[in-house]
Amino acid sequence: MIWKSLFSALAILTHILPALTAPALDSELSSQSEDKYVFAHFMVGIVKDYQLEDWKEDMTTAQSIGIDAFALNCASIDSYTPTQLALAYEAAEQVNFKVVISFDFAYWTNGDTEKITEYMKQYAGHPAQMQYKGAAVVSTFVGDSFNWDAVKQNTPHPIYAVPNLQDPAEATTGPAKSADGAFSWLAWPTDGGNSIIPGPMTTVWDDRFVHFLAGKTYMAPVSPWFSTHFNTKNWVFVCENLPTLRWEQMLSLQPDLIEIISWNDYGESHYIGPYSAHHSDDGSSQWATNMPHDGWRNLFKPYIAAYKSGAKTPTVEADEVVYWYRPTPKGVVCTGDTLSAPMGADMLSDSIFVATMLTSPGTLTVQSGNNAPVDIEVPAGIVTSNVTMGVGAQSFKVARDGQTILSGQGGLDVKDSCVHYNFNVYVGSTKGGDGSNTTGARGSM
């Protein structure tokens, strides 16, 4: 999606200062619902050829890690939107999953109230529709100035609107007051919109949303990555430790709802779902093909369970490592690309990132290319470590009490040459027990 930043520097300063005097988060979140749900942002616009079984496969895969619903991002201009929404609702009902319509206001307009109302009248009472506090959830991408009053008044079933607001201060003024809460898209280090800052990721935007919502529902964003390389948008956020850091923040904040960005947005490289052969290619295959992210689902699962239970730390039930790394060092000049390296690339580190998921302490050994092996003592639980990137194969091992409990090699070598810039990451995982490699391991591609 193309983020349309509506912030000016003055506006940011104007709204940040009041937020600094806001009450502590614990008190502001005390009225949250005991029922916590996790959604995943799903791009309907790239699945025009999906069949019922495709939807069911994605949904059961999402269910397996604790995701409750897909937020179905749909555009008004796509002729197949009605067909795919119908299939999504049918599939969700069959597998006991839920869905939410997320109107993408890069395409919908404030003049589409009647059309949006018709969709809500059609699906608000559907068995597969996600209900929250007795009402059908509806969301958006942008759409800050849309007034939900007419939709609510003309839909027999109660509506619970949680639109995406670009500026949290909008929650207290104008059309956004008609909503029941808000969803933030600011899941990466930023000063607002697409501005890129060195990081680290903080909860400053979450704090501001909670403050301005003043007790209304806050749906917080979680995203493991963001890199895109189109001629109209070409940047990468500093997001290297987000796969665990952002979840740690969520366990501390305990927001009302969470939306994972995303399930299948290959264009922005933050997908956690399988790379589907049945999607239409917008050019992102250049950086998403053979770059699996499946291992992140393994990593997210215990965090989702912890969030729903109100725990501050995740519970690890089996030993595993999940690793992610770029295919080239950031300074490599690609020979056949008409575009420059993504904006923000210089802020990244040339590192290999490894999340250990251990039932008890162990020694992580990482060898990156021709670099000497690096040993890191890691405690039980989930911990993210990193080592300097080296050109060549990437190998991972965990030992405990002098015995190797798991080992594996990444399925992608780091190279010092390239044709096109690719700041997406390769994600793999290796589980303990029989020492076998799992998702993203050598030979699985």
From Swiss-Prot:
Subunit structure: Monomer.
Protein localization: Secreted
Organism classification: Eukaryota, Fungi, Dikarya, Ascomycota, Pezizomycotina
One function term, GO molecular function aspect: glucan endo-1,3-alpha-glucosidase activity
Main location: secreted
Catalytic activity: Endohydrolysis of (1->3)-alpha-D-glucosidic linkages in isolichenin, pseudonigeran and nigeran
Record's keyword terms, sorted: Glycoprotein, Glycosidase, Hydrolase, Secreted, Signal
Signal peptide residue numbers: 1-21
Function comment: Hydrolyzes 1,3-alpha-glucan predominantly into pentasaccharides. May enhance the efficacy of fungal antibiotics by degrading bacterial exopolysaccharides.
Entries under InterPro entries matching the protein: Glyco_hydro_71
Residues the record marks as carrying a glycan: N386, N437
Top EC class for this record: hydrolase
Protein's name according to its UniProt entry: Mutanase Pc12g07500
EC numbers on record: 3.2.1.59
Gene3D superfamilies in alphabetical order: Glycosidases (3.20.20.80)
GO cellular component terms, A-Z: extracellular region
